[in-house]
Amino acid sequence: MMVHAHPDDESIVTGATLAKYAAEGAGVTLVTCTLGEEGEVIPDDLAHLTSDREGTLGEHRIGELDKACLALGVRDHRFLGGPGRYRDSGMMGAPTNEHPRAFWGADVEEAATLLAQVIREVRPHVLVSYDEHGGYGHPDHIQAHRVARRAFLRAGERAMPGTPWQVRKLYAIAQPVSRIEESIARLREESGSFTPPARVSDIARGTPETAVTTRVDATDHWAAKALAMRAHATQITVEGERFALSNDIAQEIDAVEYFTLLVGPTPRIQHGEYETDLFAGL
């Protein structure tokens, strides 16, 4: 089970992993916490959808997410608490952080209980979300981490009505600094029509190498990831092996994805090596 903040996050940072496990026959569930109502819109012909105009971007992005899930082979998708229960909070410090339905302001225990109910229904062995920094500091990503971490415990508590289920492993999505730096070097040579990134922070906060435990090589599923990213047309421009968000900064579409094991059996690996399977040790 993967827990993401907005439609498109699942494809950008975990799309290849989702496609790999879905293709291998694993039960894959995607939980999205908001509709992404505050996203910027790239195509001019869809600019009318934004929250400061028609305000229908969230509904439109449901359709984009449906297409992305189809591309990835994800058959079980849920919105946390149902579509629209929690709203995109916008970037940190934005007035939309104070919206009464903003996910950033949601009661963590309440949201975690909703997620725990899904966990008990689906009974996953592995739960994946963000690290405590939310990858790049977006409030909804930080909140998704908090909610997923609490739900990981909540689902196994006997004090919660229903049959407990204890997920075996909890992961945070990782973006190794060295991997980003290597990508930046390539993009400085060839970024297509996009602006080449100047520094690591142009792409992500970056994860220290010592914190990265797991490397999933899903190269065979690169095309599925790229197709899923194309489905999020309001948010992502795909050009060959590269893409850009609304900031027009080039990034590579990478089908090798990284994670940090937060809770679970310690990987039996040599120093300097990675665990290669999210289900290892189960």
Curated annotation (Swiss-Prot):
Keyword Zinc assigned: yes
Binding site for Zn(2+): 6, 9, 141
Swiss-Prot/TrEMBL catalytic activity: 1D-myo-inositol 2-acetamido-2-deoxy-alpha-D-glucopyranoside + H2O = 1D-myo-inositol 2-amino-2-deoxy-alpha-D-glucopyranoside + acetate
Cofactors: Zn(2+)
Parts forming coiled coils: none
EC main group: hydrolase
Record keywords: Hydrolase, Metal-binding, Zinc
Annotated function: Catalyzes the deacetylation of 1D-myo-inositol 2-acetamido-2-deoxy-alpha-D-glucopyranoside (GlcNAc-Ins) in the mycothiol biosynthesis pathway.
Protein name in UniProt: 1D-myo-inositol 2-acetamido-2-deoxy-alpha-D-glucopyranoside deacetylase
Organism from which the protein derives: Nocardiopsis dassonvillei (strain ATCC 23218 / DSM 43111 / CIP 107115 / JCM 7437 / KCTC 9190 / NBRC 14626 / NCTC 10488 / NRRL B-5397 / IMRU 509)
Annotated gene: mshB
